[in-house]
């Protein structure tokens, strides 16, 4: 799941996948703004066939936060 997540983030935010770690913060480390995050969430929803409510998005600061959230929805790593 981490590799797939890195690919999505790299494509959506235009960053090198090698610079993405579990503790990478979307805002602080990748300089993502609210529009970037919105587009990233849409891409994650499409890739994993899930829906992430807007209220939950604000709690997803790092790559690991998203992976743990997806695991909580029953997706396997």
Task: Give names to the regions the model predicted.
Residues 48-77:
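C-terminal structural segments of small proteins and small subunits
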Residues 12-31, 48-59:
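Phosphopantetheine carrier-protein modules
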Residues 1-18, 72-76:
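Thiotemplate assembly-line natural product biosynthesis machinery
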Residues 2, 37, 50:
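Functionally critical, cavity-lining and gating residues within the transmembrane helices
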Residues 31-41, 63:
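Amphipathic alpha-helical interaction surfaces in cytosolic regulatory modules
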